[in-house]
Structures are given as C-alpha cells and as structure tokens.
C-alpha cells in the first residue's frame, strides 16, 4: 500500500466502522483492495470515468463486483450530484480522481465540493488526494474549507509531496477527535498504517 493510500485511510480515526464508502477514482485499486480486505462489512462503491482503467481491474487484482463492492463506469461528479436526492448517502467519500492533465475537470469544480458536503451525513468524512504536480492545491484546500468549514486537515505525504485533505462533519465532533487520538496507535498497528 503506497503512502498516500495509508494517509487516506486515516478516515478510520473519525469513522471507524463506515457502512458505506464512495470512492471517486479507481486507479490501480490500492484503496479499494485495502478497504475490501480490512472493512468486510462496509459497502464500497467506486466510480471511475476511464473505461481503460476499469479494463485493467483483473490485472491489478481488484476483486469482482459483489454484494459489498460495485465499480461503476461514470463521471464521479455526476454520480455525487445524483446522490443528493438518494437515501444511500456514504459515510466516507474518498476522492482520488486524476487524468493525464491533473485532477479531473468535473472534480475540480466548486460545485463538486458543495455536492459532496450535501451527501455526507452528520458523521461524514470527506478525503481528497491532491497530487504533488497539482498547481492549484492551495485553491482546492480553500474551496474545501469554504464549503465544509474548519477543521480542514491537509496532510503532506512523504517524499512525493502529495497532499491528503480531510474535512467533514465528523471532524468537528470533539468526542470523535479525542477518541481518534486514543485509537490512532491501535489502528496503526492493526492495519499497518501510519497516521
């Protein structure tokens, strides 16, 4: 599991037993494989815009769809917008959506961040990976802060310089923050993570 995947999994400190996780971006599948393995009672939905990435699913040993895993070919921003009127809100929204030009255009829009906030419940966690080469990382963090409010926690990842940004209602709950601090070392050891 690569460094930024480990950092993105820090959502477990704020939402240790998510019922539903929505992932925008499949990539090489490290996030979905980790969640599928370590969170067996969690329903995972992954939305990937590039059919060629989905076609490599078997090559990257990403498990097949089943009752708790579904990979959908589509635009993540549109999928999130469609969830606004749904009862199937995710507890956690993990965003790692890039194309050859950087962050996917529809994901970079302020409307996506606003819709993301609307689909997360009172216990929700929003996590976004911003690649090191993304020139507008500061702009993205400020957009997230404007929509979600403080705290927004940007964490620089290892030598590559990626930034993982955490936001959402769960981060404002003082009891959750205290519990997160107490549970961090236990979760790190159990899942071989580095928070």
Residue ranges: model-predicted function:
Residues 2-6, 12, 161-195:
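SAM/dcSAM-binding transferase cores
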Residues 104, 110-174:
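C-terminal substrate-binding/active-site "lid" region of AdoMet-derived donor-dependent transferases
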Residues 74-83, 101-105, 109, 148-150, ...:
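A short, terminal or domain-edge coil/loop segment
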Residues 2-123, 160:
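The AdoMet/dcAdoMet-binding core of the Class I SAM-like
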Residues 32, 141, 184:
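Generic structural marker for isolated residues within well-ordered, non-membrane alpha-helices
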Residues 41-43, 66-68, 123, 149-151, ...:
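A generic structural signal for alpha->beta connector loops
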Residues 50, 65-73, 125, 145, ...:
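Short secondary-structure transition/capping segments
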């Amino acid at each position: 599991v690569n460094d930024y995947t480990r950092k993105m999994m820090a959502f477990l400190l704020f939402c240790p037993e998510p019922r539903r996780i929505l992932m925008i971006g499949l990539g090489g599948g490290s996030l979905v494989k980790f969640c599928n393995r370590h969170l067996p009672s969690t329903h995972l939905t992954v939305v990937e815009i590039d059919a060629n990435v989905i076609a490599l699913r078997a090559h990257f040993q990403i498990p097949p769809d089943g009752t708790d895993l579904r990979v959908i070919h589509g635009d993540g921003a549109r999928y999130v917008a469609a969830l606004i009127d749904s009862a199937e809100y995710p507890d956690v929204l993990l965003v790692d959506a890039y194309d050859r030009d950087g962050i996917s255009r529809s994901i970079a829009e302020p409307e996506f961040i606003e819709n993301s906030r609307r689909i997360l419940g009172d216990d929700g966690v929003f996590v976004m990976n911003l690649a090191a080469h993304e020139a507008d990382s500061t702009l993205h963090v400020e957009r997230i802060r404007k929509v979600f409010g403080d705290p927004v926690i940007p964490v620089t990842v290892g030598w590559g310089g990626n930034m993982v940004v955490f936001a959402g209602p769960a981060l404002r709950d003082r009891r959750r923050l205290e519990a997160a601090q107490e549970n961090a070392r236990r979760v790190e050891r159990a899942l071989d993570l580095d928070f």
